[in-house]
């Protein structure tokens, strides 16, 4: 995915960066007359939940997901579908490819969300320039996601003396 995203951005003449953690940033400049609008950051993650049935022989690193249509649903044979945040990635790619009036857009694709948010945790503070971020990873259709599904626990101790 990292190589695909890098090629996607570069082939369209968009500023594209891959950081040392493997996160990808593709920036789309504002359209004419919209340069003074605030930069909006859109974020999705590019990894998937790799689960399979015991009798399914698949190598998630090399083998394609076998899909089929069941009514109105796309499903996978013996594995998870691998579309956890695929819709978020697809929305970003459509915006990067689209011809519409817009302010500056930064599309951030983070890695390793499923295994501890290591992509987001490894991101440097200057990787993006925008001040507004919209996370495109949500569990339910038609709902806006306000915070992060991942997290960190902090335990602090304080000695109090009178």
Language-model regions, residue ranges each:
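Generic marker of residues within folded, mature protein domains
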Residues: 16, 32, 97, 124, ...
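Short loop segments at secondary-structure junctions
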Residues: 29-32, 97, 159-162
């Amino acid at each position: 995915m990292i190589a695909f995203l890098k090629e996607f951005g570069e082939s369209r003449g968009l500023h594209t960066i891959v950081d040392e953690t493997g996160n990808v940033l593709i920036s789309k400049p504002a359209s004419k007359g919209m340069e003074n609008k605030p930069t909006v950051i859109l974020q999705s993650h590019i990894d998937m939940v790799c689960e399979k049935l015991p009798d399914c022989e698949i190598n998630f690193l090399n083998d394609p997901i076998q899909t089929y249509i069941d009514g109105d649903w796309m499903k996978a044979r013996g594995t998870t579908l691998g579309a956890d945040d695929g819709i978020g990635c697809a929305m970003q790619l459509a915006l990067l490819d689209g011809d519409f009036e817009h302010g500056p857009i930064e599309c951030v694709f983070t890695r390793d969300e499923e295994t501890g948010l290591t992509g987001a945790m490894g991101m440097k503070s200057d990787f993006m320039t925008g001040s507004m971020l919209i996370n495109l990873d949500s569990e339910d259709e038609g709902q806006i996601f306000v915070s992060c599904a991942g997290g960190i626990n902090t335990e602090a101790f304080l000695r109090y003396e009178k």
